């Protein structure tokens, strides 16, 4: 650059510049030279003031919003320094006013100019300086002069020489601020050619000058005490900032209300508004709460009450690695530093080793968590399916190291199978087992005299009280007991007692009261050991029941179905849904293209030939697209418009993925469409081959059961595999919510299911009837068999199966409904006779003693006596049979002393008087009622009874309070009997209940004797409405406006009040009402005058 150009650049401060379109703003600037002059020379330079107007439309709205605020702050700084008398600034560097540099290169393509808003120590009112017009101050509102916007908080000598964050104008919480809230992110440093660039680097001479002046002697009294802590410029984490600049905040208590991202100290950015847009720091609202002013700067992780436990999870469902060489290669890692997670090999399910706990869920992982809890806090414990591997995650690495050293080589899960402990890492995701032989005391052999047999570490957790069980339906959920985990390694001698507590809930004799913590609303536990025997053990019984049906069926098909069911090779794992399609690295049909294709197909823009061409083009991505949100709709259209040949090609590509597709919320629609559109034998065969091996998990799935019902429509023999799978895994399916309903749907499809298939399934229901009747889902099939099935003699065939466990079933609340359904069936008296004879004995046998089953049932305190009472209340019982049952029940109740019979049963058999028991109960309730509401009325009398206050309810039911007419006896005095017409002294101390007898009025507060009335408390106002009383004792008869007097007539009452006949009148509102209470009516009476 030549000399002339340099001269022009040096004189640029005298030239008006473009500031903001359409706004006149005073700009205070000072020109600096870049030749290294001293501070004294800088302070002696005059300050120029310029005010210019320009209009241009090339600046953005953001720039327009910034400039007025900056100008206002600069102008306010000038006014603050001038004062009212226009005094000059002090030129000393120790001034109480701080300086803030704002280097602002101007918008010029060929030059850049350094501007400063204000410099301390430079006078403003020198000759030749420009003075802004007075009306400029009216453009913006300036705050109080005590608010020094550009003066930072005081700094100490030990503070670092880093300029604080500039706090610029807060953005309004408007719609535009919410839409563009991301604009608060600091921009990258611009070059000097930018209009509004960031501040200069610290190496700039101007910044060096400013850093020397940032040592004020006084502090700002208006410093904001916002509790939001400053974020370091080197890291986005808050805790790191505390160590670097903690002294600065502690000594000076600076206002660092800045949410700018790191490395934005020199940026001229705005504050983020409080909007719904994504925040830079997710913890910003946490620090903005005023109530958290004294919160610690360190983040704390809340402690879990119990660890995360899960048994037999899919190893592919989590992302994990370990140094154990026995795991699959994809989960192996050669070198891994100590982590907070360990892997334990040779971990076998405890449910297989403990038959009495086979219905417990998450048992192994719970026991594993209790075992490892003594080494530290356990976050999660998981066992992996088919790997005999467990992953235990601790809260710290030290706990994991301690557990690894202690458990290495120990027999954790099974004796003779030492476990290998290795470090692991859980990465985030974008033969018949041996049974215990019980002795006479009910304890396992070897536990006598506290001589414990060798047990693996996991099984010890079951016996030392660290794990308790809660029954949820037919499964037991182990509960992590944190109180016992502290002393579990000290009390090894308590194993026998703990084992007896575990077995207590599974003993048949104590099954009903072994779990006292369960509420009445929870599902009842099955009284039989679960799971039931396999169908292989019930084959003979199954064939016997089929013969009892005596139905015309093909015996060959029945035998073939049973034989194939016994040799069924399909999976019984309800979580195995077959292979998944391989994920595609790059998809040709992305969502935008799929959306366009669907629009074109829906608008009939493609012909069938073009759709078939599209199907061939999408063939490689077809399995993946079938489970896509948009792709499954395209696949459905392809199967609707393609020919059989194209459908064969597509089914060949997708058939092996039908199971995994059918259980997906999107893929199930494409899967059902494929099955529905399959018509040719080749297509049907491909569909059945795809779902045959995974029928059981499909039936038990909420989406997959609809897939099975679609396959059912293929008919015999294509749907034969469905019945084979149901018979082979009968209990696994029928106890499931979806499985039981899917089986019922198969039985109700009369036009599709063959008689042989229906007969075999019906025989399976009878075979497992005692188990099904105790399960809420299985009971649906028993109900179908009794109510819907058309097989002859089905009740008589089912009754013998129920009588073998009659006591347990009748004492079970749910199972007893099945028994009552058989007893109330009118079309089969033989079934009713079988059940009643098993409970109460044969009615024709003379002097027969009650069966043992009846004694056991009446001793069952849960539901047994209630069931017997319901049997006696059946309307179908003949008189002689009812008398026989009552006789047997009376004999058992009188002979046994251990039975606690219910009141209703005692009344039913005549051992208790219904009236006496009823009256006694009523009196108890009445006494309790009187004592509970006595404080609500006036001062009670000696009897403790009170009158009913006059209200709508008391007028309509005045005699509803069941109190006697006898006075209450106190201090041994006898009670006098009162008749309705007997005169009563008003001064009598006796009290009487409020009854609406004809001719008797409650009188209170009168002098003298009151005839034809009875005493009442002063809180009753009924006398105010019945009569008028004069001071001379005369009582004037008034027509009573009651609900029963329409004509306002009076009736003469002589001596016998009871001779009045009840009658019905109409009131003035024409309501036909007769209010009778205890054979009395409201009557209109005439009271004779005392004169």
UniProtKB/Swiss-Prot annotation:
Q: Which InterPro entries match?
A: ARM-like, ARM-type_fold, Nucleotide-bd_a/b_plait_sf, PUM-HD, Pumilio_domain_protein, Pumilio_RNA-bd_rpt, RBD_domain_sf, RRM_dom
Residue stretches making up the PUM-HD domain: 557-913
Enumerate the GO terms in the molecular function aspect: mRNA 3'-UTR AU-rich region binding; mRNA binding
Ranges where the record places region Disordered = 31-51, 75-131, 482-534, 568-591, 911-981
- What are the Phosphothreonine sites (modified residues) in this protein? 131
Q: Does the keyword Oxidoreductase apply?
A: no
- Which terms are listed as keywords in the entry? Phosphoprotein, Repeat, RNA-binding
Start and end residues of each RRM domain? 340-426
Gene Ontology, cellular component aspect: cytoplasm; cytoplasmic side of mitochondrial outer membrane; fungal-type cell wall; P-body
Task: Describe where the Pumilio repeats fall, as residue ranges on this chain.
Answer: 617-652, 653-689, 690-724, 725-760, 801-837
Residue ranges, compositional bias (Polar residues): 99-111, 568-577
Single biological process term from Gene Ontology: protein-containing complex localization
Cited PANTHER family:
PROTEIN JSN1-RELATED
Q: What is this protein called?
A: Protein JSN1
């Amino acid at each position: 650059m030549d000399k002339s150009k340099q001269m022009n650049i040096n004189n640029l401060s005298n030239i008006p510049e473009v500031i903001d379109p359409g706004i006149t703003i005073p700009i205070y600037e000072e020109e600096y030279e870049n030749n290294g002059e001293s501070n004294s020379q800088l302070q002696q330079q005059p300050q120029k003031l310029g005010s210019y107007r320009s209009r241009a439309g090339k600046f953005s709205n953001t720039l327009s919003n910034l400039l007025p605020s900056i100008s206002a702050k600069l102008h306010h700084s000038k006014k603050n320094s001038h004062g009212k008398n226009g005094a000059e600034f002090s030129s000393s560097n120790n001034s109480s006013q701080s300086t803030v540099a704002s280097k602002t290169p101007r918008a010029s393509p060929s030059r850049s100019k350094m501007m400063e808003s204000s410099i301390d120590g430079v006078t403003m009112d020198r000759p030749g300086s420009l003075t802004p017009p007075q009306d400029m101050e009216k453009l913006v509102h300036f705050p109080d002069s005590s608010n020094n916007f550009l003066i930072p908080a005081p700094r100490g000598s030990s503070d670092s020489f880093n300029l604080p964050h500039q706090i610029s104008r807060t953005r309004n919480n408007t719609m535009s601020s919410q839409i563009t809230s991301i604009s608060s992110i600091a921009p990258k440093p611009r070059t000097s050619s930018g209009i509004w660039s960031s501040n200069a680097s610290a190496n700039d001479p101007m910044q060096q000058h400013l850093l020397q002046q940032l040592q004020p002697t006084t502090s700002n009294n208006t410093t904001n005490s916002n509790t939001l802590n400053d974020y370091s410029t080197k890291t986005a984490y808050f805790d790191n900032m505390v160590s670097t600049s903690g002294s600065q905040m502690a000594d000076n208590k600076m206002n660092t209300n800045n949410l700018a991202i790191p490395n934005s100290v020199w940026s001229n950015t705005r504050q983020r508004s409080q909007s719904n847009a994504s925040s830079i720091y997710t913890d910003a609202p946490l620090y903005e709460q005023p109530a958290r002013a004294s919160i610690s700067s360190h983040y704390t992780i809340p402690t879990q009450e119990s660890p995360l436990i899960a048994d037999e999870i899919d190893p592919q469902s989590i992302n994990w690695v370990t140094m154990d060489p026995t795991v699959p290669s994809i989960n192996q890692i050669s070198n891994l530093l100590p982590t907070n997670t360990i892997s334990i090999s040779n971990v076998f399910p405890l449910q297989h080793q403990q038959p009495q706990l086979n219905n417990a869920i998450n048992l192994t992982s719970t026991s594993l968590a209790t075992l490892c809890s003594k080494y530290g806090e356990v976050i999660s414990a998981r066992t992996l399916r088919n790997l005999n591997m467990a992953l235990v995650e601790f809260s710290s690495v030290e706990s994991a190291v301690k557990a690894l050293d202690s458990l290495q080589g120990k027999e954790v899960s099974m004796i003779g199978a030492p476990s290998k402990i290795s470090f692991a890492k859980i990465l985030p995701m974008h033969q018949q087992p041996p049974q215990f032989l019980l002795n006479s005391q009910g304890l396992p052999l070897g536990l006598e005299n506290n001589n414990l047999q060798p047990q693996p570490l996991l099984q010890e957790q079951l016996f030392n009280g660290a794990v308790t069980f809660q029954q949820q339906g037919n499964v037991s959920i182990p509960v992590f007991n944190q109180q016992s985990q502290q002393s579990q390694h000290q009390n090894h001698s308590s194993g026998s007692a703990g084992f007896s507590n575990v077995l207590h809930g599974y003993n048949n004799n104590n099954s009903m009261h072994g779990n006292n913590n369960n509420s009445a609303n929870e599902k009842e536990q099955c009284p039989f050991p679960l799971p039931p025997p396999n169908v292989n053990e019930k084959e003979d019984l199954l064939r016997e029941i089929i013969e009892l049906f005596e139905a015309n069926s093909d015996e060959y098909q029945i035998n073939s179905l049973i034989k194939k069911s016994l040799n069924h090779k399909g999976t019984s794992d309800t979580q195995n849904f077959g292979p998944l399609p391989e994920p595609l690295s790059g998809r040709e049909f992305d969502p935008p293209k799929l959306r366009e294709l669907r629009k074109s197909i829906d608008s009939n823009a493609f012909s069938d030939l073009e759709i078939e061409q599209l199907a061939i083009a999408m063939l490689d991505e077809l399995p993946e697209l079938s489970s896509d949100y948009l792709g499954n709709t395209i696949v459905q259209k392809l199967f609707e418009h393609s020919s059989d040949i194209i459908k064969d090609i597509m089914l060949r590509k997708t058939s092996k993925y039908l199971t995994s597709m059918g259980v997906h919320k999107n893929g199930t629609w494409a899967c059902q469409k494929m099955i529905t559109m399959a018509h040719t034998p080749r297509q049907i065969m491909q569909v059945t081959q795809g779902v045959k091996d995974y029928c059981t998990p499909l039936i038990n799935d909420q989406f997959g059961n609809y897939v099975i019902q679609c396959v059912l429509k293929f008919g015999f023999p294509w749907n034969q595999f469905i019945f084979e799978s149901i018979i082979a895994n009968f209990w696994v399916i029928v106890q499931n919510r979806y499985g039981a309903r899917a089986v019922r749907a198969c039985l109700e499809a009369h036009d599709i299911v063959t008689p042989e298939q229906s007969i075999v399934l019906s025989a399976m229901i009878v075979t497992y009837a005692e188990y099904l009747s105790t399960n809420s889902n299985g009971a649906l099939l028993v109900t179908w068999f009794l109510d819907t099935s058309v097989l002859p003699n089905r009740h008589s065939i089912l009754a013998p199966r129920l009588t073998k466990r009659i006591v347990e079933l009748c004492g079970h609340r749910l199972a007893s409904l099945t028994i009552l359904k058989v007893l109330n069936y009118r079309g089969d008296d033989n079934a009713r006779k079988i059940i009643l004879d098993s409970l109460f004995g044969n009615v024709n046998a003379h002097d027969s003693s009650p069966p043992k089953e009846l004694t056991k049932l009446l001793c069952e305190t849960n539901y047994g006596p209630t069931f017997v009472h319901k049997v006696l209340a059946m309307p179908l019982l003949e008189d002689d049979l009812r008398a026989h049952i009552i006789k047997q029940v009376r004999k058992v109740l009188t002979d046994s002393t251990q039975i606690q019979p219910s009141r209703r049963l005692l009344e039913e058999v005549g051992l208790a008087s219904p009236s006496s028991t009823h009256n006694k109960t009523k009196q108890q309730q009445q006494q309790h009622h009187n004592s509970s509401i006595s404080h609500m009325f006036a001062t009670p009398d000696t009897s403790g009874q009170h009158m009913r206050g006059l209200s709508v309810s008391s007028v309509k039911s005045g005699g509803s309070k069941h109190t006697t007419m006898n006075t209450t006896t106190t201090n041994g005095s006898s009670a006098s009997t009162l008749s309705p017409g007997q005169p009563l002294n008003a001064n009598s101390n006796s009290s009487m209940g409020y009854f609406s007898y004809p001719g008797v009025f409650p009188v209170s507060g009168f002098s003298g004797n009151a005839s034809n009335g009875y005493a009442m408390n002063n809180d009753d106002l009924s006398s105010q409405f019945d009569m008028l009383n004069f001071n001379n004792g005369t009582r004037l008869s008034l027509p009573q406006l009651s609900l029963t007097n329409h004509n306002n007539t009076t009736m003469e009452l002589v001596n016998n009040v009871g001779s009045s006949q009840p009658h019905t009148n109409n009131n003035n509102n024409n309501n036909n009402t007769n209010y009778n209470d205890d054979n009395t009516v409201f009557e209109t009476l005439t009271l004779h005058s005392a004169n």
